[in-house]
């Protein structure tokens, strides 16, 4: 099924993952799913099961239409971008997935992963806030720089999203569960847990 979507002459299965060259894009290749692991630093914590099942059905019928991006590590590869496609491919019973292998510094890998996920619209507000916090604290980016890298958000919008991390735990849980929206939670910032 991959062969009909991606010409096999573009695939390179001889990539050397021990290369130290930073920010190198490899040729497109198939990689065994068993050699790939999710990145524990990825901002997305929850995956919608129905959406994954739908994507898996599409992968079964049409193949993986967009390669994932991975970086080599000691055990194989870590996902930089495309964890949903990876999980859907597992559910679809695929053995290999098309992937671009990029050799990146750990900082660049985390930054790309965070930005790729932030550019998607389906992160919950707390996942977004946590990703902004990592970009600010680990990479010393200003709010303006974060806004530019994630698609033109204003510094004020970034700041307001970061404030959600100061919510009481019960309010954060309600946002993640979808029981309340971000705007409904804002007045609760700074209140003690016992009041909420």
Regions found by a protein language model. Give the residues of each.
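Short, charged/polar connector segments at secondary-structure boundaries
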Residues: 1-102, 113, 119
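Amphipathic alpha-helical extensions and coiled-coil-like segments
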Residues: 8, 123, 127-145, 149-196
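Switch/connector loops and helix/strand junctions flanking conserved nucleotide-binding motifs
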Residues: 107-110
């Amino acid at each position: 099924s991959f062969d009909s979507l991606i010409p096999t002459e573009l695939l390179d299965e001889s990539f050397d993952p021990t290369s130290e060259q930073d920010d190198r894009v490899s040729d497109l290749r198939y990689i065994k799913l068993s050699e790939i692991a999710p990145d524990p630093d990825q901002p997305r914590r929850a995956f919608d099961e129905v959406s994954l099942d739908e994507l898996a059905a599409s992968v079964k019928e049409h193949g993986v239409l967009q390669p994932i991006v991975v970086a080599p590590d000691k055990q194989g590869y870590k996902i930089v971008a495309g964890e949903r496609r990876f999980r859907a491919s597992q559910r679809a019973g695929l053995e290999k997935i098309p992937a671009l292998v990029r050799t990146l510094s750990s900082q660049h890998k985390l930054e790309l992963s965070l930005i790729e996920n932030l550019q998607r619209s389906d992160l919950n507000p707390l996942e977004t806030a946590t990703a902004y916090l990592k970009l600010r604290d680990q990479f010393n980016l200003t709010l303006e720089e974060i806004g530019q890298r994630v698609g033109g958000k204003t510094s004020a919008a970034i700041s307001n999203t970061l404030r959600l991390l100061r919510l009481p735990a019960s309010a954060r849980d309600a946002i993640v569960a979808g029981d309340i929206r971000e705007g409904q939670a804002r007045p609760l910032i700074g209140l003690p847990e016992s009041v909420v």
